[in-house]
Amino acid sequence: TNGFKIMKRIQVLLLFIVISCSMFAQDRLSLFIGRANKYAAVELSDYRKRLCVEYNISNQLLDDYYRRCGSNWGNVGLALEIAKTSGRHMREVCDYYKRYHRNGWNRILVEIGNKTRVDVL
């Protein structure tokens, strides 16, 4: 019974850690979405530079993501942030986008395994 109590405490601790990590990722994604309008207000060249610097990617990769994300810079920004917060490779996020974009970003997030709701205008 003593071993059972220890196992139960370890399970509760692990659950707490998982929930905490998930909440941090959701907060980061929510912050990005909140900044989306601010990003959209800048010139395209500045936006591209910000994405390259913030996500440490080259212009060539950025152009590839643009083509793979429906030729929409807003989608590229969201996909980059989702990749960063979910720990997925951007290639995977683009594949999910290609498969589920008709159903919106919420469906893409569900398929990736992120429970954050995205309200995109």
Where do the language-model regions lie?
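Short, Lys/Arg-enriched N-terminal segments with co-localized hydrophobic residues
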Residues: 1-6
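Secretory N-termini
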Residues: 10, 23-26
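General marker for long, soluble alpha-helical cores
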Residues: 26-121
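Hydrophobic h-region of N-terminal signal peptides that target proteins for export
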Residues: 16-24
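Sec-dependent signal peptide recognition
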Residues: 8-15
